[in-house]
């Protein structure tokens, strides 16, 4: 009889720990994994750790990375990198003071530059003191080869161009700097070898820190450990696009067609390989990416795995409605995922939500790639929630995702108020979800734009974002209809909870301001799935979701921090919810 496991999902940036620099980091991740393992969790699915832009802190979307192969150095713990102990002995307490512990949102333009200053001091001290880890660094650098060198060159060159007023977007740089292998870039690298070594050092530190987090998870007893998130593409103005030239799609954005959930479709502002380039290069770029993702994880989640079959391509400057499908070699890609998962003894999960081609899920399943089943979409044609026993086997069961409402937020209708705000913003946009050029323009479904930065209430009609509130948003003329529909949906979910034995049969439905989070978590955990994943936002019964798909509307995408530090997350209420999850998982085993 197969064991029914459970895990959590976490937005890495949102984690808190004592002494952090104002944002989540790899040390907090290791601590969270160990804490969750001690409570019975077997996995921690994390937001992408792809490389961002060290010189462009306002570009904060984890799904619009500079490079998918390399790591995000913004998540480094400055006190845990080589050289940090030397800096402490030399300088004493750090001069830079971190934000107050209760800061609700990350202020990246403050946090990241300060962190880079501290990391630079550690690098200088480490190099000056001739530490024995120098050999490990050189081995990492040699193993990374030309690809690592190109990424470090990009980060150094971008910082130089920003500092000298040339701009962050490599497509606007002087022609001789628009690709890595030119004599002029070689000359820059020679003149700025120190900066390039620093950026290489940061990648080495990030690789070590992720490896340490996975080791902490396994040492604490997790069967899987970290589940890395593989974004669908990389930013068109980033390191990958600069280094890989014509092997990536140009003049278009990857996105999704209009559907029931996004009437205008989506253009995400990212690019990926052309099908021809993948074949011509023997799929080597894809294999390298998979190996990088599996290197420090017990599994991967592939964002928008539907793109393995066909990718919705949107013309630059056009709307997502102007897009068309570009076909990809599905069977080759899924076989390579299966091969690398087997080589790394890891699990592979495909985010298969959206417009799914006929037979697609069966082809994924045949190669051992598990799809995702999310509570909000597990409904019959009449609106009834499907009982857990009817959920697909060999898939991953989830209450929600980063793009969807939390359980508490859905029950209270918080998402309805935000959807109204987002719809108003979309109506004021001349071209919905444009696939523009600007560096830092976030994917419509996966990011935030500069005018949202650190401010959840830029628009006067934005709903409250305090997770402490315990009343639903007030009804307005344009909210009464969706709120009435939500009341019907709450009743349907409550009936489903009762029929599944997750809520007392004779109890009346809880009010809109009393979400039955524990019962809902147990309901999802009752599915026959081998792994149920619970977002931390649901384990903590928070109201707000990490990201709101759509145009900029004041929602603080990818900026919210958890309300408590990792050492204080698992309080009595959370323990009660975990007990309900574990009981439901055992019940699912007995029903198998």
Predicted regions and their residues:
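Acidic/aromatic-lined carbohydrate-recognition and catalytic surfaces
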Residues: 1-244
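Hydrophobic faces of well-ordered beta-strands that scaffold small-molecule active sites
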Residues: 6-10, 44-46, 226-228, 300, ...
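Active-site-proximal loop/turn and secondary-structure-junction residues that shape catalytic pockets
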Residues: 14, 50, 230-236, 306-311, ...
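Active-site-proximal helices and loops of the catalytic beta/alpha 8
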Residues: 62-63, 214-215, 233, 237-263, ...
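Active-site cores of enzymes that catalyze phosphoryl transfer or operate on phosphate-rich substrates
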Residues: 131, 137-186, 258-271, 275-301, ...
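Conserved alpha/beta catalytic core and glycan-binding cleft of carbohydrate-active enzymes
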Residues: 136, 352-437, 466, 470-539, ...
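Intrinsic, low-complexity polybasic segments
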Residues: 440-446, 450, 455-461, 471
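Low-complexity, glycine/alanine/valine/leucine- and proline-rich hydrophobic stretches
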Residues: 540-569
